A protein has these predicted regions:
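Post-cleavage N-terminal segment of exported redox proteins
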Residues: 2-46, 50, 102, 117-125, ...
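Short glycine/threonine-rich turn/loop motifs
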Residues: 23-120, 185-310, 315-318, 326-331, ...
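Short linear regulatory motifs and low-complexity interaction segments
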Residues: 335-337
Length: 368
């Protein structure tokens, strides 16, 4: 509740994609940009091309946009994503929208930046399948269009082009995928008290009150990222891990000692995937804890949770209302965060909460 205060602030209304020097959309803070990777039009253009190039997969059929489609709110609407040869991983594809505001990347926060994150899917066997990044560099150093774009963006050609520049360009493009100005933003920060429906307004009260959603999906005085950028065990996936936690942890640690990468382990092993943040921190307290995702555009980014196990927003509300389980008679995880407990919401409150979450949709995605 301490994060939520009713004040009014007017900000610039802006649509995707965000120009280099533009103010942030209504409801969002200034965009964090690394000092060593400033935004430029040339870099963004290059990053856009890299993001959509299917030659960077072993089959020539998969690119970043395969799992992050613009016309599907930069997700793929699958429970878990499909890579080369229709191989599936273990995780639901997070939206790229507003990923630039996240303190860490991936569900378990295993990479600290968009730059670091962008390199991993290329070399994951269930995503784009390359053995290493050499094929990417071979293409961009020889392709005439890439040669021109890299020279304009970085002043580099030939062997001067490395994965550092590739990652920086992709990250620069992803930092343009920004969206605010939702009905909630216009209601909360724009002073338009008719921007949300009566049901959504009631849902907002549930969100900040009895539902306690705001404890993790933060709303602040002048902006709302709808995430605290922290990791929590809310009970998702517990049944997969139940009674074999020690065995799975031991197997994972042994694999790491043999040189296995976390990125590959968590996407190719269903049990390892459920370790969550523990796979990164090594702390038992982080078992099955996953990053708090933003709720912006949530109506367009289902299925939900790290494993895509909840199909609808109604399922999500039911899951939380039951204290960390979709079915009230299912067992509860013994590792639940302390704040996860039954909410005792009425059917009307649950319906209103769903309507509020639908009011977090930015106009450019409203018709998707």
């Amino acid at each position: 509740m301490k994060h939520y205060t009713l004040y009014v602030s007017i900000a610039m209304i802006l649509f995707i994609c965000l120009p280099v020097s533009a103010a942030p959309p209504l409801g969002l803070p200034p965009l964090p940009i690394p000092a060593d990777n400033p935004q430029t039009p040339e870099k963004i253009t290059l990053g856009d091309k890299l993001f959509h190039d299917k030659r960077f997969s072993t089959t020539g059929e998969v690119n970043c946009a395969t799992c992050h489609k613009k016309d599907q709110a930069f997700t793929d609407n699958l429970a878990v994503s499909e890579g080369i040869n229709q191989l599936t991983g273990t995780r639901n594809a997070p939206t790229v929208i507003n990923a630039a505001y996240m303190a860490t990347q991936f569900w378990d926060g295993r990479e600290p930046s968009l730059e670091a994150q962008s390199a991993q899917p290329f070399v994951n066997p269930v995503e784009m399948g390359l053995k290493n990044h050499d094929p990417i560099l071979k293409i961009v150093r020889a392709d005439a269009e890439y040669v021109d774009l890299f020279k304009k963006a970085f002043g580099k050609t030939g062997d001067q082009i490395t994965m550092k520049e590739v990652k920086q360009a992709i990250a620069a493009f992803e930092r343009t995928v920004i969206a605010g100005d939702s009905p909630f933003d216009r209601y909360q920060y724009g002073g338009d008290k008719k921007a949300m429906s009566p049901a959504a307004i009631r849902g907002l009260e549930v969100f900040i009150g009895q539902g306690r959603c705001v404890s993790c999906h933060v709303i602040e005085q002048t902006q709302a990222l709808f995430t605290n950028n922290r990791f929590h065990n809310i009970g998702v996936g517990f049944i997969k891990l139940a009674d074999k936690e020690d065995e799975v942890i031991q197997a994972f640690l042994e694999s790491k000692q043999k040189g296995a990468t976390v990125d590959i382990e968590v996407l190719t092993n269903e049990n390892t995937s459920e370790l969550g943040r523990l796979a990164i921190s090594g702390k038992l307290q982080d078992i099955a804890a996953f990053k708090t995702s933003t709720l912006r555009n949530i109506d367009k980014t289902g299925p939900y949770m790290h494993d895509g196990s909840l199909q609808t927003l109604e399922d999500v509300v039911t899951f939380y209302n039951n204290g960390g389980r979709l079915v009230e008679t299912d067992p509860l995880s013994p590792y639940l965060d302390g704040g996860i407990r039954p909410l005792k919401l009425t059917d009307q409150q649950k319906a209103d909460l769903v309507e509020f979450m639908k009011a977090l949709t930015s106009p450019e995605f409203a018709k998707q």
